[in-house]
């Protein structure tokens, strides 16, 4: 089994606490509302929403995938960190066992946020991850993030 790690960093004008509430704490409600073509719904299968929780995300008609299951490892509301694993679903290829994700939102000096993400692809055997697979995932995540950011700018009184 191999582990391939990819890091990404980008910025937002939205303050970290507000962005964390929308992007992490209320994503299961917000994303289907603003991007139903991407995510149809999210449901908790086990747990209370905290560490150990297993969620099923059902994708919308605009997606190439049907569903995925996430297992939440940690949610830190004070330090604005979140980690989970993608453990099941058709977004995992036959060569990938799971993908671990870590997200940290850091308050930027200008009042916005620096978003730092780490993705760890756990492969089966000696399979290598193709760069275009990772790039496609990053582009989809960036697009979804921009939708959330746009929603927060259009609705400044929400998630305070």
Curated annotation (Swiss-Prot):
SUPFAM superfamilies (UniProt xref): Bet v1-like
Domain of life, source organism: Eukaryota
One GO term describing the cellular component: nucleus
Pfam families on file: Bet_v_1
Keywords: Allergen, Flavonoid biosynthesis, Pathogenesis-related protein, Plant defense
GO-annotated biological processes: abscisic acid-activated signaling pathway; defense response; flavonoid biosynthetic process
A single MF term (Gene Ontology): signaling receptor activity
PANTHER family, per the entry: OS08G0374000 PROTEIN-RELATED, STRESS-INDUCED PROTEIN SAM22
Primary role: Involved in the control of flavonoid biosynthesis in fruits, probably by binding directly to natural flavonoids. Binds the natural flavonoid quercetin-3-O-glucuronide with affinities in the low micromolar range.
Protein name: Major strawberry allergen Fra a 1-E
């Amino acid at each position: 089994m191999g582990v391939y790690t990819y890091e990404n960093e980008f910025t937002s004008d939205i303050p970290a606490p507000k962005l964390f509430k929308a992007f992490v704490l209320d994503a299961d409600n917000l994303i289907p509302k603003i991007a139903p073509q991407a995510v149809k719904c999210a449901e908790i299968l086990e747990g209370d929403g905290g560490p150990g929780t297993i969620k099923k995300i059902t994708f919308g008609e605009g997606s190439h995938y049907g569903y995925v299951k996430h297992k939440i490892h940690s949610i830190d509301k004070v330090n604005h960190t979140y980690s989970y694993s993608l453990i099941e679903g058709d977004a995992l290829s036959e060569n990938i066992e799971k993908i671990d994700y870590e997200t940290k939102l850091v308050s930027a000096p200008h009042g916005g946020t620096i978003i730092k993400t780490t993705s760890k692809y756990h492969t089966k055997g000696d399979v290598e991850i193709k760069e275009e697979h990772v790039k496609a995932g990053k582009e989809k995540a960036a697009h979804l993030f921009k939708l959330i950011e746009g929603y927060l700018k259009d609705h400044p009184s929400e998630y305070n």
